[in-house]
Amino acid sequence: MAQIAASIEYEAARPPDGLPDDMEPLPGASLRFLSIKAIDGFKIQAALWQPEGIPPTDITIIVQVHGSGGNLTSLPLRVIARALSARGYAALSISARQHDEHVNTDNFFDVRRDIEAAVVTAKALGFRSIILQGHSLGTVQAAFYVASDWDPTIKAVVLTGAFGKLPWKSRHILIQDEERYRALAFASREALKAGTAAEVLPIKMRWLGGVETPVTPRHFLTYRDEQASAADGTYWIPRIVRPILIVRDEADGIVLPFEPYMLLSAAQAEGSLVPSIRYVLLPNQRPSSREGHIFADNTEALTDAVATWLGEQRL
């Protein structure tokens, strides 16, 4: 008799505490919450937005992955999900294992299980056409997943606020201190040998906006270390076999103007598997800021850009 060795499961869940005021569906759409168990047992909170009166088999669903320390309510995920669920699309937004206070503690390779659980859940709910969207740190997680899983149900990829080459950026733009970088790299390797890769290092890492943040060895090695990290969008993007949309706000103070072009160059290089890619830069005359990175004052232009591109892809 066959036995179940591992499984992905989902069930209805109560809404998380402290939801933003606009975490309400527009007329003609609905919002409910799920608890999803990944194959390794990790519990994922998820928000399912969908148009009313249309069977899932006739709807394209956007599986959304947030950025560093975000969650299922983060911008720009919720504004895209809210707006497009009133235009005939569904969205499944997840809180991945590096959400909120767990930022900079995860292993890059483990987040794949969160995305896998969301994709499998979407298919179990009846959806047959999936778009994978990643924002900020979620862009390289999404790119890795799609590049390494040619699931025909996944039809396209949307990357908002996408970094170019995160290990290089971490060392030379964020940390900007070779002595500190080498100390983090050495301490992380020593912790790995000692079996304590999940424990926070005694050395903090210089991060976004110059903030000194706690970090685990497994996070540093798999995301930030130039030799060991796999969080390199320029490596994964040419291995994606689906159409790709990249969107950046002109006022983005986190992703630098040249970074999307690193991804474009990689996607268009000789031998790339990418069938088509488009880069949309949304005009914004405000000074560069963290708010620009999350499209805080450009939400309508963002949702229009995504909806227009999806329509062109006949999705």
Question: Language-model segments: which ranges?
Answer:
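Residue-level signal for short, function-critical loop segments
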Residues: 67-68, 136, 250-251
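Catalytic nucleophile-loop/oxyanion-hole region of alpha/beta-hydrolase
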Residues: 72, 97-131, 296-297
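Short, surface-exposed "cap/lid" segments of acyl-processing enzymes
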Residues: 52-87, 93-98
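Short beta-to-alpha linker loops that shape the active-site pocket of alpha/beta-hydrolase fold enzymes
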Residues: 68, 90, 95-102, 163, ...
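Primarily recognizes the serine-hydrolase "nucleophile elbow" in alpha/beta-hydrolase
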Residues: 129-186
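A conserved amphipathic alpha-helix that caps or lines the catalytic cleft of carbohydrate-
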Residues: 81, 119, 145-146, 264
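N-terminal cap/lid segment of alpha/beta-hydrolase-fold proteins
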Residues: 4-55
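Serine-hydrolase catalytic core
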Residues: 190-287, 296-303, 311
